């Protein structure tokens, strides 16, 4: 009589999240062991220092082997070498591509090239983030950029599809890629008060409204050389923005626009007199920013110009955010009552995004 046995062999790869964090943060095995000892793990587990050293080294070896798969996350899901539950795979990917705000703030808008990579030593010293971690984060930004730069369609969707990131992290990477592609200036002293979140918020608005993808029309010819849908600003839209100059060049239109805004806001703004006195300067600033966006340098200086032409003047007159919101809403809407103005749709596409950005940028 024979018996049949079904044998299953399991070899689940164990992932210690704390050790993974130390590895991601760029600590050597020696430093990681020291930090684990300091956390009290020996007392908690009754392990010896030698066992802790061996455990840490084993984890580091596993992470090094996993790293090549993390460079192309779908490969991690389909490989058979490491038996890792799906929830653990998602954690490994998400944390590998996570970044430090202090680091991304230093490289945001810069070209993701060898030249910038040479500055990582200085960035590491300035931020206190280990050089190894800086390199990982920079290489991640560059890798995502290279994969999606030639793709059509939604930037966020492309990033999620190829890197399996959460929606929030994919949106952050879309902002990083968008800023790197358009080279927006973010490093000037007057912009240092702005966080990555501020810039990412504005990037999302611009991607939704100012890029070729925002037009919502993909090329019918598959061989078309149309610019990347969500990566590049719509150049035709930027050229058309020069038409808005009539709002400040035509004295009658400017006076009527001011009259409409002042009539609507009288008694509603705490800074009404300041707004009335500065209306023309503020309007010229906002319209001239639009008219200059035909030049690459002025596109790069967009945030510098917005802070100089609008945020700083309002801040110096102590406008509360609520008054800024009231003003921008009425300033935008009143243009629809100007009979001599014929570019309403263009104005709405410009100011709809600019209004959201300015409200986000207006803080201490």
Curated annotation (Swiss-Prot):
Highly expressed in heart, skeletal muscle and pancreas. Expressed at lower levels in brain. Also found in placenta, liver and kidney. Disulfide bonds: none annotated. It is a peripheral membrane protein. Keywords: Acetylation, Disease variant, Membrane, Nucleus. GO terms for biological process: fibroblast growth factor receptor signaling pathway; platelet aggregation. It is found in: Nucleus; Endomembrane system. GO terms for molecular function: fibroblast growth factor binding. It comes from the Eukaryota. GO terms for cellular component: endomembrane system; membrane; mitochondrion; nuclear speck; nucleus. The modification N-acetylthreonine is found at residue 2. May be involved in mitogenic function of FGF1. May mediate with IER2 FGF-signaling in the establishment of laterality in the embryo. It is linked to Thauvin-Robinet-Faivre syndrome: A rare autosomal recessive syndrome characterized by generalized overgrowth, developmental delay, learning disabilities, and variable congenital abnormalities including congenital heart defects, renal dysplasia, and skeletal defects. This is Acidic fibroblast growth factor intracellular-binding protein. It comes from Homo sapiens.
